[in-house]
Amino acid sequence: MLYRGMDRAELDAAYNNRAAVPSAEQILSDWAERSARLRRERQGHVDLRYGDEPRQRLDLFLAANPQAPTVAFIHGGYWQFFDKEGFSFLAEGPLTHGVNVALIEYTLAPAARMEQIVGEIRRAIGWLDEHLVEFGGDPTRIYVAGHSAGGHLTATAMSLGVVRGGLAISGLYDLEPIRLNYLNEKLRLDEAEAGRNSPLLHLPTKAGPLVVAYGTAELPELCRQSIDYAKAWVDAGLPGHLLPIDGADHFTMLEALADPHGVLTEALLRIIR
């Protein structure tokens, strides 16, 4: 057995979200259409550069109110797929409640190793801290959220002093099973690198509140990752809690953030307020 009683084929299947959700491709197509519509309807500052690499850029959608808080959203895709444009639809929920939304893009594997990706997210948040005031935002109220790989990257950003709180959605917090399955063909993690970049093994000594959310219809390994991380977070005396979303799978989870009245939107607002 390779990991927790699973052989390689079983471990591959345990992290294959697209195979587990038959409607995944249709959902992704729907996200793209809704994201394009939001970008047409909401004037945003797009492709703001936080670094010199091609994918070191972010989009910033501003709420109507001045000095608004900002949530920086980090997209998923197992660190090797997708871009910020495909997740613009998520901005609708927070914007409706007067929260700015920054969508962060980053260099993907195999062009980047994990530590570079983690570093890029930290750099993007630092850019927001420095430049939000130029757009009328409040740099003292920066929050971070992310889905799947973005949930992992959200967790790695929680130790930054400028981050006031976070929402980690369907994330990966222990990278050892990732190192051992098909995802590592592009990630190229070795054992030490997986350990260094596993949030479960490197909890901050001080942080703002973190909500760790997962869908009860997700793959069991994805559920376990969130449950284990939330427990470790709380056991370390850090503020936050676990938030299971009943009946949600890995993809439908995000509807609870896109919806202005969704469970994840409400959780984010509670962190901010």
Predicted regions: what is each one?
Residues M1-R273:
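Alpha/beta-hydrolase superfamily serine-hydrolase fold, recognizing
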